Amino acid sequence: MSRSESPRPLLEMRGISKTFPAVRALDNVSLTVYPGEIHSLMGENGAGKSTLMKILSGAYRADAGGEILIDGQRIEIDGPLAARDAGVAVIYQELCLSPNLTVAENIYVGRELRRGNRRWGTIDRAAMARGCQDVLARLGAPFGPDTLVDTLSIAEQQLVEIARAVHTRARILVMDEPTTPLSSRETEHLFRLIRQLREEGLAIIYISHRMAEIYELSDRVSVLRDGAYVGTLERASLSAERLVAMMVGRDISGFYKKEHAPYDPGHLLLSVRDIADGTRVRGCSLDLHAGEVLGIAGLVGAGRTELARLIFGAEPRVRGDVKLGERTFGAHSPRDAIDAGLVYLTEDRKRQGLFLDMSVRDNINISVCNRDARLGALDLARGAERARDAIASLSIRVPHANVNVGALSGGNQQKVLLSRLLETKPRVLILDEPTRGVDIGAKSEIYRIINELARAGVGVIVISSELPEIIGVADRVLVMREGEIAGELGGHTHTPITQEAIIALATGSQAELADAH
């Protein structure tokens, strides 16, 4: 049943507030969702989206005064079981599955079928397998009920979570950043599935920072800011400028802030020739000029990150040369790269970039603390000053420099990592998925930093899976396919940088068309 066929809302959250010690996370927020609707929820990190959904899912109790209605009836959701009984299911970014159990056992978790006594009887695994076959077939699952979850891909595990929600007869399905770990093809399959569930009458609450996804899926979009409800837009009135202004509370004109002047690069900074690792990168060459932003695009698995790590010296190469100016650095030496003025921002900031249990100050200073050493002792005052300057210049939202970086939002963590790299005064900066998992406001600030660095003469390489981002920030784009450079757009090629052109090069369809002619 579509929204047009059902004027009565399925879900109403009215006047919801939530206070934590010294923090008011939600302030009188309301949300209305109809059956057969994909209702997106947007806002910067810390806006209150997750808190609102945790109240709906029973993970949190709201403050007194608000109410939740389903089908017009007021209900109390005092825990996850109450939420499930009310028809609410949530699929979080971190999937909640038991990898050592089968698909059927995960679908029935907490509702196991038993032989004989329903409470104490032995678990009837065969009955559970039979009981979930229909829902797996309905969702087009490429695996059976007896498959161990540990053997499934992330996309398939996500499908198990959706199957569990459908099997419990959920009517309201919340999805929090579901495409973050997925490839483009897996994302397309997920979108088809979401639309199928909408046609079956489910209400989908979809949380994402990715504007393209919001446009593609949403029937309506509601925006939160600083714990308060800002407004709801119908699909017909959606625009990036309007959504961003609602989220950040100000107009962000020129979101990417790129001044698309005629291509006029500075002197050659970085030269990479015939670099290869023997398997994933096969003879790639590129040049980067002073003041240039070079985008590297391609499908997942094309070799973009591997190429960046080879250039940086983080992975051994079997052949090829990397020169920064007149200096050639070793085959496996990030230290040489950093000393020469080349730094790399990893795509996995939590595991490979940041020290989450250390302070913001220490994370910013750790690459340059030897500069402050005097007779074997660190100059703590200079380190504190450096951290304060970085916090101010990159607009890092933090109460003080001594807070652990693990407590910050994704966008602020990314800016801490970026500030550490900038303290080394780089000549070349490689950014691997620099805005992954960060909110709209933080994205805009990162784009500002990229463009300021380029104007100062730094050469910047941006690797991104978001095509609007690549198109928005880059002067020139290299597209990779199967470990090789498939083509170049922009720059002196005078070939427009478009999504269609990038996709054609990334998939090989352009080459296939040429061969056909």
Swiss-Prot record:
Domain ABC transporter: 11-251, 263-507
Entry's localization field: Cell inner membrane
One example GO MF annotation: ATP hydrolysis activity
InterPro entries: AAA+_ATPase, ABC_carbohydrate_import_ATPase, ABC_transporter-like_ATP-bd, ABC_transporter-like_CS, P-loop_NTPase
Top-level enzyme category: translocase
Keywords in alphabetical order: ATP-binding, Cell inner membrane, Cell membrane, Membrane, Nucleotide-binding, Repeat, Sugar transport, Translocase, Transport
Binding site for ATP: 43-50
Topological type in the membrane: Peripheral membrane protein
GO CC, any one term: plasma membrane
EC number: 7.5.2.7
Catalytic activity: D-ribose(out) + ATP + H2O = D-ribose(in) + ADP + phosphate + H(+)
Family: Belongs to the ABC transporter superfamily. Ribose importer (TC 3.A.1.2.1) family.
Protein name per the record: Ribose import ATP-binding protein RbsA 1
Organism of provenance: Burkholderia cenocepacia (strain HI2424)
